């Protein structure tokens, strides 16, 4: 009977997996024009805030130095000097537009993810009965396995997620989430998360093995440690 209930709850589980993608796509399409209009009308004059100003000025100085270097190498007449100033002005405008678009992208993606999280949380609370049914079925299935298979399954899962070869996978996943929120790629932040997040998970797992598995099946813990060594 519990297996039958679990099977009826599988569509709910599938909807939880695929619902965020659908929400993200639909909200991105509908939110981005609104965010673009709001940003361009109310925020364009204050675009060069402290962070943006530093970024734009750094790039502007680089461009100006390149143009001035070009000017020193060649003996430009006055008309060419005027074109030089116009070129710097155009490059500055393009730079401001680029940073403007980047911030629109960040705001729209961040807002979409917040809304997706809120909708998914409400959906999970409303479907709490299905989640409880699935959880009980998974626990029943796991406890019916032999201790050797249990230990092998736990070891396979942990080595895949937080083992020696897992950092590259974590780097890809964290980078994907970081990009999904609209932020530009940052190696230092991603490396910091990759070096700390798996360690936290490993600590939680060891506590779970010691506190939970040692209470329900001491032999499973012994087999797990033997296989792990």
Swiss-Prot record:
The protein's name is Potassium/proton antiporter CemA
Q: Which UniProt keywords apply?
A: Antiport, Chloroplast, Hydrogen ion transport, Ion transport, Membrane, Plastid, Plastid inner membrane, Potassium, Potassium transport, Transmembrane, Transmembrane helix, Transport
**GO molecular function annotations of the record:** antiporter activity; proton transmembrane transporter activity
Q: For this UniProt entry, what's an example GO CC term?
A: chloroplast inner membrane
What residue ranges are annotated as transmembrane? 7-27, 106-126, 154-174, 189-209
Q: Where in the cell is it found?
A: Plastid, Chloroplast inner membrane
The organism's superkingdom is given as Eukaryota
Q: Which family does it belong to?
A: Belongs to the CemA family.
PANTHER family referenced in this protein's UniProt entry, alphabetically: CHLOROPLAST ENVELOPE MEMBRANE PROTEIN, CHLOROPLAST ENVELOPE MEMBRANE PROTEIN-RELATED
Pfam families from the xrefs?
CemA
Its chief place of residence is: plastid
Membrane topology type:
Multi-pass membrane protein
Q: Give the catalytic activity.
A: K(+)(in) + H(+)(out) = K(+)(out) + H(+)(in)
Which BP terms does GO give this entry? potassium ion transport
According to its UniProt entry, this protein's organism is Amborella trichopoda
Could you tell me what this protein does?
Contributes to K(+)/H(+) antiport activity by supporting proton efflux to control proton extrusion and homeostasis in chloroplasts in a light-dependent manner to modulate photosynthesis. Prevents excessive induction of non-photochemical quenching (NPQ) under continuous-light conditions. Indirectly promotes efficient inorganic carbon uptake into chloroplasts.
């Amino acid at each position: 009977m519990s297996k039958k209930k679990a099977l009826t709850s599988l569509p709910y589980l599938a909807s939880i997996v695929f619902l965020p993608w659908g929400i993200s796509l639909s909200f991105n399409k509908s939110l981005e024009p609104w965010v673009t209009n709001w940003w361009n009308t109310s925020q364009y004059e204050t675009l060069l805030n402290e962070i943006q100003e530093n970024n734009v000025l750094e790039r502007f100085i680089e461009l100006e130095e390149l143009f001035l270097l070009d000017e020193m190498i060649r003996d430009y007449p006055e008309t060419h000097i005027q074109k030089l100033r116009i070129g710097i002005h155009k490059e500055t405008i393009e730079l401001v537009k680029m940073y403007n678009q980047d911030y629109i992208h960040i705001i729209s993606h961040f807002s979409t993810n917040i809304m997706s999280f809120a909708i998914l949380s409400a959906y999970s609370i409303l479907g709490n009965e299905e989640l409880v049914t699935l959880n009980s079925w998974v626990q029943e299935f796991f406890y019916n396995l032999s201790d050797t298979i249990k230990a092998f399954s736990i070891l396979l899962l942990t080595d895949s997620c937080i083992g020696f070869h897992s950092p590259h996978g974590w780097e890809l996943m964290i980078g994907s989430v970081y990009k999904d929120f609209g932020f530009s790629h940052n190696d230092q932040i991603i490396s910091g998360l990759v070096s700390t997040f798996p360690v936290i998970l490993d600590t939680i797992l060891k506590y779970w093995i010691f506190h939970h598995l040692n209470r329900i099946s001491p032999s499973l813990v012994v087999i797990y440690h033997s296989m792990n060594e």
